[in-house]
Amino acid sequence: ALVTTAFVSGTVAPASAATKLKIAHIPKLGTIGYFQAADKGVQRACKELKATCAYKGPTEITAAAQVKEINAAVQSGYNVIILAANDKDALVPALKAAQKKGVTVVTYDSDVAPAGRSVFVNQASSEGIGNALADSAAELAGGEGDIAVLSTTPDATNQNVWIDFMNKEIAAKYPKLKVVATAYGLDKPEESTTETQGLIQKYPNLKVIVAPTSVGIVAAAKYVSGSASKGKVFVTGLGLPNDMKTYIKDGSGAQASLWDVENFGYVAAQVANSIINQKASVKVGAVVKSSKGDKGLKSRTVTKGAVGNEIILGPATVFTKDNVDQFNF
């Protein structure tokens, strides 16, 4: 039988019965707009829950930098860590140590091995994202030709899973598409621009660059838009509408899609509260009712994902020149 649990805002349970949350939000890198948008959702949830929240953004996109933030959060008395992981396995020892000290760990955006957290809040099914990237690349390439990938780091859990599913979908559905290379821009604009330029120079027949990263897609689209490759090489992937608006509307043919990033952070924080204050089950099969501030689904079923148990945020929105002005994040 399914186990029914619920998200809880601070007004549901008596204040005396609720554990006061102290939440450390640790993104992959503190300066990335995507994670700053997610933090707005974390802060919105914290206001509802009367929780203490802090954005603990690392200055480097490495596992080592996140381990420092994890350890510092534990030492400072935080009882919740919301984490977008830079590495699937390297963070687990520090996270297990945190859990032994009573810290609840919820991952979102990019997961760790299940031993390091309670549950993963996934933006969408990894297979669905990979398939959508393949479909977009095929559309822009006209169903055949060379395409390349511009990712973040070689160790990025979520990007690696999406790319794997994308490659499988291309092999099965688009045999005339050829993925010629995967480059890594480290989620830094300068490095991503350099890698974009390198891909175009090395592969003169390149038709599409797929960038499943909010930093990489902007760097690639900006470079292509201002180069002789405009109208010849097309960029698609995952990006914020405010960042991609110019390139979607300027005739360079860029595409982008993304989920509600602000709500992403909100849901992750509310899941943590449910685990702590409602003893919510996050085992596969549990049905989690959404809190009133959730802008997505009315309930979410905990499912088995690529790594372990996960909660799906909801479907992504494809941003086009016709709808991109309707979004502001």
Placement of each model-derived feature along the sequence:
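Short, solvent-exposed amphipathic alpha-helices that sit
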Residues: Y34-L49, I129-L133, T157-L177, E191, ...
